[in-house]
Amino acid sequence: MLLKPHSRVQVFEGAEDNLPDRDALRAALAIRQLAEGLTADDLLLVLISGGGSALLPAPIPPVTLEEKQTLTRLLAARGATIQELNTIRKALSQLKGGGLAQAAYPAQVVSLILSDVVGDPVEVIASGPTVASSHSVQDCLHILNRYGLRAALPRSVKTVLSRADSDPHGPRTCGHVLNVIIGSNVLALAEAQRQAEALGYQAVVLSAAMQGDVKSMAQFYGLLAHVARTRLTPSTAGASVEEDAQLHELAAELQIPDLQLEEALETMARGRGPVCLLAGGEPTVQLQGSGRGGRNQELALRVGAELRRWPLGQIDVLFLSGGTDGQDGPTEAAGAWVTPELASQAAAEGLDMATFLAHNDSHTFFCRLQGGAHLLHTGMTGTNVMDTHLLFLRPR
């Protein structure tokens, strides 16, 4: 960013690869100093989005930045959700969990928020720097036990947790703070739905709260495509009672709130042309290998593997998964798209899908398949409101 001469704006860059670093720590301490100098006559405007946790690291002494960073990496590698990661971050931070609001008191605080978290909980987004935390030390210990990390905690982390009060981290009322959601996955899906309808699709938003294990989610989408076939083409044999029940069991297993599954099935049963099912959220990938990829490319690859399991008859199916920020994991792609022909296309080029999945190497797979034709490239969008999943179904 180029500033005008004598500008009062200060720009701090940091958190390369979305990980807290010394530059981000320097910025966080400067922000704290600015906030602590405000009075009741001041207004603090805070812009919050995904990545805010990494950009505002200020560990509570004696915890060091490196110790906090290592713990976050270990939790993420073992499949911790963003909510769980942020609960730990808040417990170890001076500014998260309402700490920034506390530092700015008694100034008025207005936070404009882009949500990158399922359900848009303001206390979780960027670890809630302007929202009092409702989590206790016991919540943190429960998370650490779940992922087998409590025994391996550094002494400094144990010290901070042992002396932490279980009361909210920030002021009890936060009456001087106004938090406003200005962008979210719900809004993104609503616009995508309008665009799909303009293209002639019957469009249904399944949920903006898709989360859970990426394997189970892929199974859900694969089976959904099969069950959808029987609704779109009534002349074909219908899905069995067992398959319908299995689809609902998978949905229950994923614990998707407000899932509009019945509405989607009823829309397809009316048989009025092509259908676009939309969903959004953030699945969890447990890392087992050292390959390159991201959750969108992994989900797309797994859905492609699932689609070959089911007879899809006289409908064309395409599944796309993409990150709204334009970057899926440490790759240049936003995601990928697949069709039921993926398995045969891969086999024709000597690519074993199972091997790539075992190494979490979805990006390498899609780069090699047909010269990268299945990759979704949008460039960086500057806005992260999680992922979007699109399932297109068109009778032939």
Curated annotation (Swiss-Prot):
Cystine pairings recorded for this chain: none
Gene3D superfamilies: Glycerate kinase, MOFRL-like N-terminal domain, MOFRL domain
Catalysed reactions, semicolon-separated: (R)-glycerate + ATP = (2R)-3-phosphoglycerate + ADP + H(+)
Gene Ontology terms: cellular component: cytoplasm
GO biological process: protein phosphorylation
SUPFAM superfamilies reported in the protein's UniProt record: GckA/TtuD-like (SSF82544)
MF (Gene Ontology): ATP binding; glycerate kinase activity
PANTHER family named in the record: GLYCERATE KINASE
Name of the protein: Glycerate kinase
Annotated organism of origin: Macaca fascicularis (Crab-eating macaque)
Highest classification ranks of the organism: Eukaryota, Metazoa, Chordata, Craniata, Vertebrata
